[in-house]
Amino acid sequence: MKILEIKNLCKVYGSGDTKVDALKNVSFDIEQGEFVAIIGPSGSGKSTLLHILGGVDTPSSGEVIISGTDISKLNETKLAIFRRRQIGLIYQFYNLIPILNVEENMTLPILLDGKKPDKKLLRDLVNKLGLKERVTHLPNQLSGGQQQRVSIGRALMNHPALLLADEPTGNLDSENSKEIIALLRKFNRENKQTVIIITHDERIALSADRVITIEDGKITKDSGRRGLSA
């Protein structure tokens, strides 16, 4: 089942002499349960693409269809609701709230949506992420790897259709990087969680089911599906 369809996606910044074509007629689709790495040099358009997929930015033209909804047609309010309920975002810098503990950071998006957190899911995530002894700790009491685990848990609390990660290991050492990717793979395999990662790290790309290369705003290579996670 297609979880994501991108059709003739374009993104233009500025106009006239300052015009920049960040994305140029990008088209591809992703099946539910895929683990996809998007790679490319700095300025290639890969982060712009991820921001559009995450509903953080809007396209100049084209379609972005997630779970049957074309988010490019949504107004700002509906897009914010869709993003909160259907998309999990993980960044290089963890973006945790300093005055909230681990549990509070993980459940904040659910509370902002006016819902009660799923306590069973919270316990399950805390255990799988190795944070059981850290639930009352503040971000400044955690290591970088632990903070990124919290951000992963926060992103998964809403059962997202898509889990999007922008350089999730870029601020971590090699050992913590391996652990974070292993965790993302674990959720991908066990829960059929669709994962898209923007990365410069070739080791991460090699661990993906599929690698899409972007250069100068265009897809220049797509490895194709090497088989969905079982």
List the model feature ranges, each with a label.
Residues 2-214:
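ABC family nucleotide-binding domain
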Residues 218-230:
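Conserved beta-strand-loop-alpha-helix hinge in the C-terminal portion
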